[in-house]
Amino acid sequence: MIYAELAGGLGNQMFVYAFARALGLRCGEGVTLLDRQDWRDGAPAHTACALEALAISPGVRILSEPQFAKTHLPRQNAAKALMIKYEQRRGLLARDWQPFERRMAPLLNMIGLHFATDGYTPAHRGPSRDFLAWGYFQSERYFADAAGTIRRELRAKTPPTGSFAAAIAAARWPVAVHLRRGDYLKPENEILQVCTPEYYAAAVAAVAAAKPEAELFVFTDDEPWAREHLPTAGLPATILPQGAAANDLALMQRCRGFVLSNSTYSWWAQYLADAPDKIVWAPDRWYAHTKRSDLYLPGWRRIATQTHP
């Protein structure tokens, strides 16, 4: 059995699902996702499991038993705890851990653990009866061989309806603009403070230059700020009230253009979009410091970002 621990909001949970599901298909094994409720105490970035609103495979089980790994996978869980402690003591967010995690992967895979917080670290199943995955797995390379399956299974079970869905359908060239503020503005998340007002101004100007007929649909966790400060470059703009994560994601997917924040949530919106002529504008850095990202895809138009003071 392949086990993977869920973390973060819907976008991060989708990457964990995609990694584990693709590995399960490769190995012909079942998948259980461990919904760590205990992580959410005092940690709002770790939200409730939202995957059940998506068309995930009925063969993927979601288990809400916080101590499962500690009780049933003691060897893998102990190795995971040591890796977390080592990286946290040396600055989990401030450093690029991919080279270290790649060096450790063969040994960890042999004992039934895959640990990957940064970039792409290939996973090898190893001989252990049970296999535990912990990390963020934020790279399409983890599931490229199962991309069709992943795209089908990570769509909303219920297609969006209502006035906003109708407005997007009626627009000549709808563009989803994702503006994330909230937890990104906290001092401890300085590494995520990339998408400044200047970034959005430049990105929207690029949209207007490329597609003068574009209409903006703004998805944000800070509607008042967006109404007062978000530049539109003269394009018509609709600022949507924040709704359920899966429904908003499904609305974004119906657009043809995408202005991304450095968020996995907007990454999935563009990835799952069907428009053959879609255009993606993204910040040229995913992190404010030296950490690298494997999230960039061919064809994206990168917008220069200022170094955070």
What are the residue ranges of the model-derived segments?
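Histidine-anchored nucleotide/phosphate-binding helix
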Residues: 13-25, 200-208
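Secretory-pathway luminal glycosyltransferase catalytic domains
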Residues: 46-206, 210-211
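Leloir-type glycosyltransferase catalytic cores
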Residues: 288-309
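Extreme N-terminal starter segment of soluble prokaryotic enzymes
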Residues: 1-3
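A short, glycine/small-residue-rich beta-strand->loop->alpha-helix junction that serves as a flexible
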Residues: 5-15
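Short, solvent-exposed loop/turn segments at secondary-structure junctions
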Residues: 9-11, 37-41, 137-141, 180-184, ...
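A short beta-strand-loop structural module common to alpha/beta enzyme folds
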Residues: 27-41
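Donor-binding and catalytic core of enzymes assembling or modifying cell-surface/extracellular glycoconjugates
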Residues: 10, 205-290
